Amino acid sequence: MGLALILVINPGSTSTKVAVFRDKEPVFTETLRHSTEELSKYKRIIDQFEFRTQAILDMLKEKGISLSQIDAIVGRGGLLKPIESGTYIVNEKMLEDLKKAERGEHASNLGAIIAYTLAKEHNIPAYIVDPVVVDELEDVARITGLPEIEKQSIFHALNQKAIARRLASDLGKRYDEVNLIIAHLGGGISVGAHRKGRVIDVNDALNGEGPFSPERAGGLPVLDLVKLCYSGKYTFEEMKKKLIGKGGIVAHLGTNDVREVYKMIENGDKNAELILDAMAYQTAKEIGSMAVVLKGKVDAIGITGGIAHNEDFVRRIRERVEFIAPVYVYPGEDEMLALAEGAYRVLTGEENPKTYS
């Protein structure tokens, strides 16, 4: 086929990112910002559908792009039921689940709905790629010490998978031929064991497992946490916020920005140095535990996410884990490219689209 034009739609809480790719090369990327005032009119996230769709159409018109030129539309996948990794065709069942939002209200739920609506009018395919609910855990990885609590797979699937594919390619191999450990360092930190193309274990980076991060508490001594819950000082919502949003570095140092922490260290703040080092230490420890999951057969370790831009922080992790396997660094995250690549693999026949059921 000739060059494919792919429209990418990635709704976030206060913005919608839109891009057009020609094959895997970006033609443009735009961030449409939505004020709190604009969004406060809508009771549920699903109610923002028409408002956001219109904003996208207006922007495409400004850019002189007609939907009739587009070969496929790909949206950010939302909170669906657990599914295996891949590129999925948006179907009625998926739309129904996203509209019900039984697994949670999140702006990413709109990605598939908007993509489908625009694609339907022009008879082109709509896809989603590797949503956060990707679940390829082995049964043994789900078990905890309490039968009422099962471990869940919630992680930065889109970026982890995209970086794992890139790393495999840099090794001259296919993703399903290698064993990798990928650490995503962002507002949350997720470390995944990728065995031959499947993430067979990963810490639940959202709900309090693994390393603490700039704004999440990570794994904690359980009984001390229970005591805190019953201290009478906090409501359920306050405790939740303490763990997710106000935990980790922000709880210790009052900022969730690692660059600010480095300024504190430069000014001689010994406590800031210790906290930062502890975050690197816990991340390295999690990488070590994933090496055990892979029985020591690790081809490479990939470090990605916003914090990977910081060479000193990467060094702190690297010096603890490079005995396991070579360490490759891919700073930042490019969700738009990862989504476009997912659609591209299907359009070129490299991968078959999956069906959500």
Swiss-Prot record:
GO molecular function, one term: ATP binding
Gene Ontology biological process terms in this record: acetate metabolic process
Disulfide bonds: none
Entry EC number(s): 2.7.2.7
Reactions catalysed: butanoate + ATP = butanoyl phosphate + ADP
Pfam families: Acetate_kinase
Single GO cellular component term: cytoplasm
Main location per the UniProt record: cytoplasm
Key words, A-Z: ATP-binding, Cytoplasm, Kinase, Nucleotide-binding, Transferase
Cellular compartment(s): Cytoplasm
Entry keyword Membrane: no
Enzyme class: transferase
InterPro entries, per the entry: Aliphatic_acid_kin_short-chain (IPR000890), Aliphatic_acid_kinase_CS (IPR023865), ATPase_NBD (IPR043129), Butyrate_kin (IPR011245)
Similarity field: Belongs to the acetokinase family.
Protein name stated in the entry: Probable butyrate kinase 1
Organism: Caldanaerobacter subterraneus subsp. tengcongensis (strain DSM 15242 / JCM 11007 / NBRC 100824 / MB4) (Thermoanaerobacter tengcongensis)
Gene: buk1
